[in-house]
């Protein structure tokens, strides 16, 4: 086994001085910052000079007390603030012996003229009280400043909350650290939000660019289609024009021949009629026979078949005009519709069994009722909830993501819809909605529901038109029309959502 001897080397001297300084610190009174004189221990274990602790416990200005002076009990330890009783002060003989040994080494004082005491450790060289000259070892929470043990006994701080300086620093650091952690968390949230915002903005810009291309392509295709149909119709009209012209030319040529023949025959008849009687009778029969070749009916200038063709084209032109007018109106109306409204659910209207998401966009049915205030707008029996905003004019639409299992319904309800007690889900009650029940989609009409012949739905658009009085439902995937309620709205209406099964949900999209 290796023996442990004194340290040698370049750092040995520094280590020895540090050890000596630490030993001096342990033998130094924390009140007077000098070697202990008559060291005594209080109940918490800390030691002080007898005179220092008694002076500290006396009221400032009362003079230097003696051991026989009667002091109130208990009193705080000047170092840790634990309660201590003056009657329980015990001489610390071991500490006195250590101090005696240190004095024999005759270590140099910390500064000239300081009663020959050794240098105090670094922790003892802290700031001192400007009023009493004592080390600032305590912290007054009421005044927010460091004080000495004498200040602590003064009238000014007697009723204040005072902590050891180290403890106050530790508490302040812990509080600052907790605030720093909270600030870092907020900063992380903001950075995450910024990252999400940037990503979503890029995605939206990308989506808008794609939509611009799609719109351009759709209108380009529409223009090409209209040009093609225009060409076909104009070509048909051109063909008919040529046919009419050709028929007209043929008829005119025929008429010209017949007119020439008739004029010639008319001249011959007139010439025969002017001849002498004998010559007239000889040529009469020949001239009369020529008259038998004259057409008995007038020629038609344009055939009925040609007229039918022209009439059909005119009819197409008339229909085209009506279709284009309706198309322009529908297209303009669709493009000028109100933007999709941003909805959130109103928790004050939600049935206690309904569980709303934190963003107030989704609703599902819980196993038991929650303890919620009995708000006058709350549905207490029907498991329904309204949106937070209602509408009294204009055109609006929103989209709803639907669960694949039975037990949901949604649509609109008038503001005065009954909230208390069990009420039917019908237009007579001011509810216009669709639902999924027994695996089948229904429009909730009255007296019987209307079955909707559609495939699986994952998202449905609700279009509310208060100008014409209509509530329409569309399958978002292909914008297929599902059903339209015709309503004479007399008051404000609110989007309505209902979930009556724990296996499904509804969510306002997105």
Curated annotation (Swiss-Prot):
Native organism taxonomy: Eukaryota, Metazoa, Chordata, Craniata, Vertebrata
Recorded family membership: Belongs to the TRIM/RBCC family.
Enzymatic class: transferase
Gene3D superfamilies, A to Z: 2.60.120.920, Classic Zinc Finger, Zinc/RING finger domain, C3HC4 (zinc finger)
Catalytic activity from the UniProt record: S-ubiquitinyl-[E2 ubiquitin-conjugating enzyme]-L-cysteine + [acceptor protein]-L-lysine = [E2 ubiquitin-conjugating enzyme]-L-cysteine + N(6)-ubiquitinyl-[acceptor protein]-L-lysine
Binding residues annotated for Zn(2+), in chain numbering: 129, 132, 151, 157
Start and end residues, zinc fingers (B box-type): 124-165
Tissue expression pattern: Highly expressed in antigen-presenting cells.
Gene: Trim7
Main location group: nucleus
Name assigned to this protein: E3 ubiquitin-protein ligase TRIM7
Disrupted-gene phenotype: Deletion mutant protects mice from DNA virus infection.
Residue intervals of every RING-type zinc finger in the record: 29-81
GO molecular function: transferase activity; zinc ion binding
Source superkingdom: Eukaryota
